[in-house]
């Protein structure tokens, strides 16, 4: 198989894959739920009113009560006590990385202070929001069949004031809330924020000073009306996965896009040692329960809202006793280094390089190399260039073998032409004679395909690394490239890519190519140039450097095998 056919296979595989991704976005946009402009969507704080029994979800499975292994609680309903005086005041908690607005039960709004919405803007990304059209919040509540539990507005801050800021030099911000129920039952909830951390610790202590046992379970949910993303290559957000993900030690990492949210009846599964999250481009929210806690994982829809929920085990607090439970709520970016510090199994998969484990592993490896290069070079653009150089060096033996195979095939082109002339239209005899020739001369006609098969998964894994890595978000390279995750504003890199592909095409020997293949080859640089024009600049930078190094390597290989580049260029010009 000559170099040209290998190139064509590689090119058309790329075109097919990119068209498939584009078709997927088109299908997603067509099937996505659309909230009409006149439709009334409850405000974000109204989302808290929907308890597990109010949402359209399956009944809770049996989860053993704490202290009574194997016991099965009755089907849970909510018996929430009304708020003492309407909705609780909204309290603002601010650390160095987060600004949260919450009422003790729900986080209503969350701003990521170190991530501006635009390159030149000052407003931070608002991940959780009270936007009436697309509310998105995180709730932690209590439910019980018979015992009183806090309802909406039930929790109140213990300390006076509505604003709590992490002071300079302070590494931890602790803000307690309390619900005082009837008959001496109370729940003390403590929010803990740490400097530089996006995981919020939430601990509940149930204090029973009544004369009767108290029964209940905690539920934690993420609820949002998904934003309808505009489809297209010019919108990088539409290429990233948007939906729910969860992890279990038994099944591993699983995910469900918003457009397919209720496929197979949603989710209703008991899991120990897992987590649940809602993902979008560069950012995510997640509930992470205690490692040894069994929870019922539920995906459901409540009107226009998609809900991902955990229901903890039911437990009983005897009179005069105290019981506690805690969890972490992640509200922040997909920063690999900070996610690793949480020490949660499988949580690294929220950086969604691929749903396939092998591709995810390749992506994680590429990012590991990329991040280490960045630690030396202090620029993500130069780190990408460094990664290309390392990949080219690692794949050089394969490239050399590929060219050697192609050169050997070209030397035997006259003999293959003689065989074709000898056997005419008898394709069977021609193929038999060809295979005998290959066997005798030790020619592997598929020798040029091995480097292609190895490079394809690396290329696509790198594509997702560059699309998914929030570390590259708004990261400049030099000059006109001020955001490696956005397209080249002046199309300089795509034009360079076209030029390099055209030069590579001219330097590629094409013996025996039929006219149809020749025409296809002429249009390939232009087709790729148009596609690359709207892709992230970091990816096009990779492709330009990779193509440029490939061109130099091909020039070197031609000379090494006794061929003259000028003759190949002249032959291709005919």
Curated annotation (Swiss-Prot):
Q: Give the record's membrane topology.
A: Multi-pass membrane protein
Q: Any keyword rRNA processing?
A: no
- Gene3D superfamilies cross-referenced by the UniProt entry: 2.70.98.90
Tell me which Gene Ontology terms the entry assigns under biological process: protein insertion into membrane; protein transport
Is Cell membrane among the key words of this record?
yes
Compartment list: Cell inner membrane
Write out the entry's keywords from A to Z.
Answer: Cell inner membrane, Cell membrane, Chaperone, Membrane, Protein transport, Transmembrane, Transmembrane helix, Transport
Any one Gene Ontology cellular component term annotated for this protein: plasma membrane
Q: Which GO terms describe its molecular function?
A: membrane insertase activity
The UniProt transmembrane annotation reads 6-26, 356-376, 380-400, 447-467, 489-509, 525-545
Q: Which InterPro entries match?
A: Membr_insert_YidC (IPR019998), Membr_insert_YidC_N (IPR028053), YidC/ALB3/OXA1/COX18 (IPR001708), YidC/Oxa/ALB_C (IPR028055), YidC_ALB_C (IPR047196), YidC_periplasmic_sf (IPR038221)
| Task performed by this protein | Required for the insertion and/or proper folding and/or complex formation of integral membrane proteins into the membrane. Involved in integration of membrane proteins that insert both dependently and independently of the Sec translocase complex, as well as at least some lipoproteins. Aids folding of multispanning membrane proteins.
Fetch the NCBIfam families from UniProt.
Answer: PRK01318.1-3, yidC_nterm, yidC_oxa1_cterm
Quaternary organization: Interacts with the Sec translocase complex via SecD. Specifically interacts with transmembrane segments of nascent integral membrane proteins during membrane integration.
Q: What protein name does the entry list?
A: Membrane protein insertase YidC
- Organism equals Xanthomonas axonopodis pv. citri (strain 306)
> What taxonomic ancestry is recorded?
Bacteria, Pseudomonadati, Pseudomonadota, Gammaproteobacteria, Lysobacterales
């Amino acid at each position: 198989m000559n170099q040209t056919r290998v190139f064509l296979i590689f090119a058309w595989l790329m075109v097919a894959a990119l068209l498939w991704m584009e078709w997927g976005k088109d299908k997603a946009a067509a099937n996505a739920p659309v909230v009409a402009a006149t439709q009334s969507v409850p405000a974000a704080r109204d989302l808290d009113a929907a308890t597990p029994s109010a949402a359209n979800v399956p009944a809770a499975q049996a989860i053993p009560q704490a202290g009574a292994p194997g016991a099965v609680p009755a089907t849970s309903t909510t018996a929430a006590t009304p708020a003492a005086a309407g909705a609780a005041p909204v309290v603002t908690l601010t650390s160095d990385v987060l600004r949260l607005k919450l009422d003790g039960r729900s986080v209503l709004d969350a701003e990521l202070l170190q991530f501006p919405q635009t390159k030149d803007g000052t407003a931070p990304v608002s991940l959780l929001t009270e936007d009436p059209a697309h509310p998105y919040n995180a709730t932690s509540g209590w439910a019980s069949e018979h015992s009183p539990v806090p309802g909406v507005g039930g929790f109140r801050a213990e300390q006076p004031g509505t604003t709590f800021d992490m002071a300079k030099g302070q590494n931890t911000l602790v803000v307690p809330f309390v619900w005082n129920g009837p008959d001496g039952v109370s729940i003390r909830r403590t929010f803990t924020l740490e400097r530089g951390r996006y995981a919020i610790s939430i601990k509940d202590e149930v204090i029973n000073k009544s004369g009767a046992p108290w029964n209940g379970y905690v539920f934690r949910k993420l609820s949002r009306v998904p934003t309808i993303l505009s489809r297209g290559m010019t919108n990088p957000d539409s290429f990233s996965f948007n939906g729910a993900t969860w992890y279990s030690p038994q099944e591993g990492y699983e995910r469900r896009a918003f457009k397919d949210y209720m496929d197979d009846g949603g989710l209703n599964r008991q899991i120990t040692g897992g987590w649940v999250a809602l993902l979008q481009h560069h950012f995510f929210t997640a509930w992470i329960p205690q490692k040894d806690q069994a929870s019922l994982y539920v995906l459901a829809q409540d009107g226009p809202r998609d809900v991902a929920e955990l229901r903890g085990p039911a437990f009983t607090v005897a009179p005069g006793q105290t019981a506690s439970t805690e969890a972490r709520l992640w509200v922040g970016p997909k920063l690999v280094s900070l996610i690793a510090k949480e020490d949660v199994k499988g949580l690294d998969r929220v950086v969604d390089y691929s749903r396939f484990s092998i591709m995810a592993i390749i992506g994680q490896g590429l990012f590991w190399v990329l991040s280490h290069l960045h630690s030396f070079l202090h620029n993500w653009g130069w780190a990408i260039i460094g990664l290309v150089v390392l990949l080219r060096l690692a794949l050089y033996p394969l490239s050399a073998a590929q060219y050697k195979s192609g050169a050997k095939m070209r030397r035997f082109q006259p003999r293959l032409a003689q065989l074709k002339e000898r056997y005419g239209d008898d394709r069977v005899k021609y193929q038999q004679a060809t295979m005998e020739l290959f066997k005798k001369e030790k020619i592997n006609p598929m020798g040029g395909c091995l480097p292609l098969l190895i490079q394809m998964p690396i290329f696509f894994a790198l594509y997702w690394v560059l699309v998914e890595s929030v570390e590259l978000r708004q990261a400049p390279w030099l000059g006109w490239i001020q955001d490696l995750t956005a397209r080249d504003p002046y199309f300089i890199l795509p034009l360079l890519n076209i030029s390099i592909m055209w030069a590579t095409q001219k330097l590629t020997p094409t013996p025996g190519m039929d006219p149809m293949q020749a025409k296809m080859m002429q249009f390939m640089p232009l087709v790729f140039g148009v596609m690359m024009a709207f892709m992230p600049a970091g990816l096009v930078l990779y492709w330009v450097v990779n193509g440029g190094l490939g061109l130099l390597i091909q020039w070197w290989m031609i000379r090494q095998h006794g061929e003259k580049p000028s003759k190949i260029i002249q032959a291709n010009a005919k």
